[in-house]
Amino acid sequence: SFPPNLYTYITINENISTDTWKVNYSKSEEVYHPIDIKNDIAREVIKHFDLPPIIMSFNCDIPTSGSGLASSSSYLIACIAAACKFKGIDYSQTEIAKLAIKLERNFNPLTGYQDPYGCALGGLKQFIFYPDYILQENLTTSIFKNYNFFLVSTGITRSSTNILKNVNFDKSYG
């Protein structure tokens, strides 16, 4: 896992003016019932944490639609972290990664482990995923002194769900 030095921003504020949930991302939604929220990430986090009427806003430093840069996982990780802060809950980064996988499986049953763990735990790491646990090794960052790394958005999109349909793997951990 190699997360770049880019960020995802989620803000959550209580909606004191109306009894609606407002979600702002590339679109804006305002609904009277969380189940009606079309943004999968916002809907699942709001339902899981039983959030009252709120205004939730998403922003990110990287392209977010099928870029292959783990942006959906970064949104989910940041959204869970923001909900925890809003509710006064103290989750570890590992707990947030596990919850991200659980919540994403509600709308994308083919989700993998690597992106949520990479986004939640950061740093240069090697993850080995076993059926009932994850082995994590922190790797030396000295490689960055010897090589230049470039993260380039090609503008080409793809669906990880379509790719994962053709992969045979065990999803029992999480």
Q: Where do the protein language model's features map onto the residues?
A:
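Conserved catalytic cysteine-centered active-site region
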Residues: 51-57
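C-terminal nucleotide
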Residues: 2, 7-50, 83-91, 95-110, ...
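Glycine/serine-rich anion-binding loops at beta->alpha junctions
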Residues: 61-83
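A general secondary-structure junction signal
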Residues: 27, 58-60
